[in-house]
Design a protein with these regions (language model features):
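Glycine/threonine-rich flexible loop motifs
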Residues: 231, 248-259, 282-284
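Short beta-alpha connecting loops at secondary-structure transitions
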Residues: 218, 311-314
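Short glycine-biased active-site loop of nucleotidyltransferases that positions the nucleotide triphosphate
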Residues: 212-213, 264, 284-286
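Acyl-CoA thioester-binding alpha/beta core of soluble enzymes
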Residues: 1-202, 208, 228-243, 260-281, ...
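N-terminal glycine-rich dinucleotide-binding loop that anchors FAD/FMN and/or NAD(P) in oxidoreductases
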Residues: 208-226, 296
Length: 365
């Protein structure tokens, strides 16, 4: 089984779970049969396969392994001098220079240096590595059989039946969180996408059709989150929500004056889902990550005959985490809420990677 096959199967299971949960919510639209393959490759379907020739993430060899480097943002290039003491000329290949610079360095050290600068860089674990030695997974109790997300019970579930008219506030951006919100909107829930008026969702800079697919069935609200008044309005909106979707690192939420557990504790039936690269807790909770590098950090890569890793799919941890999160939210809502769900792209990818490795080992036995 390839990494992509394992990811598709995990997405299929999540979609089935989403439908089962919807059937327990009075008035919700129960989705018909749907495969995960299409959702995981949806962006490529919309924007075309030519994007593969110039993707922002590469897997690069270091002195003792491999790392994923994702230069997805325009200002990432400005950080290269501080990260690698590297100046890139106009006529030079950025990737050739970066590859040369990391080739003689220790993978863990170069990743830590990049992350301190806010760069989306990650070490790719070797197939034989024991996950029980991973400090982030151990701190989050996500070593086997840890599962695909952390579920924290904050208060007893609501006594009143869940409603299909639930109010969902979607604070997320890019792919994973918006996909989660879209899948909930398809059940009939009222989803409102909230964006900063000064820093809107970065997906708007890409394909309008893809942005529309993720967010077309939602209401939209822009708030001046750089102002105290805008942040106060955001807190009022969140306090009215039955479900909140967000993808911010813990530090960013705290700066907004928002505590997920406090929001859930304040009112019966509330479900909060956080979808981040490495999770809300643990020593890596403030690390930056996107779909490709987070998947590689979870070991969800394909390997050639020489053992060299290759990226799987298109930012595959993003849509996979979005589907897993939607199923988890639907189950929690059907059960009466009262929980904070913590979904990490890396951990969702890791579940698929472990399945692929187990299948390969079984086939070789």
């Amino acid at each position: 089984m390839t990494g992509r096959d394992a990811a598709v199967r995990l997405a299929d299971e999540a979609l089935a779970g989403l439908a089962d949960a919807a059937a327990r919510v009075p008035g919700a639209r129960v989705p018909g049969p749907r495969g995960g393959f299409g959702l995981l490759g949806e962006r490529g379907e919309v924007v075309g396969e030519e994007r593969w020739t110039d993707r922002s993430c590469r897997l690069l060899r270091t002195a003792d392994g491999w790392i994923a480097v994702n230069l997805a943002r325009a200002d990432d290039l400005d950080l290269l001098p501080a990260w690698l003491d590297l100046e890139v000329g106009v006529q030079e290949s950025v990737w050739d220079r970066v590859a040369d610079a990391v080739a003689g360095r220790d993978a863990i050290a170069v990743v830590e240096q990049g992350q301190l600068l806010g760069m989306a860089v990650a070490r790719v674990p070797a197939p034989e590595e024991v996950t029980e030695g991973d400090v982030q997974l151990m701190s989050r109790r996500m070593v086997p059989p840890g599962g695909s997300h952390v579920r924290i019970v904050v208060r007893p579930p609501a006594v009143t039946p869940p409603a299909a008219t639930a109010f969902v506030v979607d604070l997320s951006s890019l792919w994973a969180g918006p996909l989660c919100g879209r899948l909930l909107a398809e059940l009939g829930l009222h989803v409102v996408k909230v964006e900063s008026t000064t820093r809107p969702d970065g997906t708007r800079l890409g394909s309008p059709e893809f942005f529309g697919r993720l967010n077309g069935d939602k209401g939209h609200l822009g708030l001046p989150l750089a102002t105290a008044a805008g942040r106060a309005e955001l807190r009022r909106l969140v306090s009215r929500a039955d479900i909140v979707i967000e993808g911010s690192r813990p530090r960013a939420l705290a700066q907004m004056g928002i505590d997920p557990a406090a929001v859930v504790r304040a009112r019966p039936g509330v479900t909060w889902v956080s979808i981040t690269a490495y999770g809300r807790t643990g020593p890596w909770c403030q690390r930056v990550g996107f779909g490709d590098d987070a998947a590689a950090a979870g070991g969800l890569v394909d390997r050639g005959a020489d053992g060299a890793p290759a990226l799987v799919g298109d930012a595959i941890a993003d849509p996979l985490a979005g589907v897993v999160a939607a199923a988890a939210v639907a189950r929690a809502h059907a059960d009466g809420g009262g929980v904070v769900l913590d979904v990490a792209l890396r951990e969702v990818a890791r579940v698929a990677a472990l399945r692929a490795e187990a299948s390969t080992a079984a086939g070789a036995a």
